[in-house]
A protein has these predicted regions:
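Acidic (Asp/Glu-rich) sequence patches and key acidic residues
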Residues: 1-129
């Protein structure tokens, strides 16, 4: 299991997932090579030996990065595991990739102010199951 964050080109004026119109279709985040290149600007050691699936392994946390198998990337999913330090990596990845994130734990737009609380709730849930 992982704490997942979905990144897409979401409307900049949306304050909540509820603010995204049903008919909204996100634009591409770019060509896969360009998206991977932007990721590598902040994490040059990200392993993209599989061009559709990257892996960032750091002491205390890891992030699997799904960019899909199409040439155009419509969304990126971050599968996050580990310590609180992972939140900083998620913030850096969202900034580098572009677009906005949706926090799978809250079901809302990624919010730096509550991201630590979100990953901690996810870890607490793991301890319960």
């Amino acid at each position: 299991m992982s704490w997942d964050v979905f990144i897409q080109d979401l409307p900049p004026d949306a304050r909540s997932v509820k603010d995204i119109p049903d008919e909204f279709h996100p634009r591409s985040l770019g060509r896969r090579d360009d998206v991977v290149g932007r990721i590598r600007t902040v994490f040059p050691d990200a392993d993209f030996s599989d061009p559709t699936w990257g892996r960032l392994q750091k002491e205390g946390y890891s992030v699997d990065i799904s960019v899909g198998d199409g040439e155009d990337v419509n969304g990126v999913t971050l599968h996050v595991r580990g310590s609180d330090e992972a939140v900083g990596a998620v913030i850096s990845l969202i900034d580098a990739i572009g677009g906005r994130g949706v926090d799978s734990w809250t079901g809302e737009l990624f919010d730096q102010a509550i991201a630590l609380h979100s990953i901690r709730r996810w870890r607490a849930y793991l301890e319960e199951i």
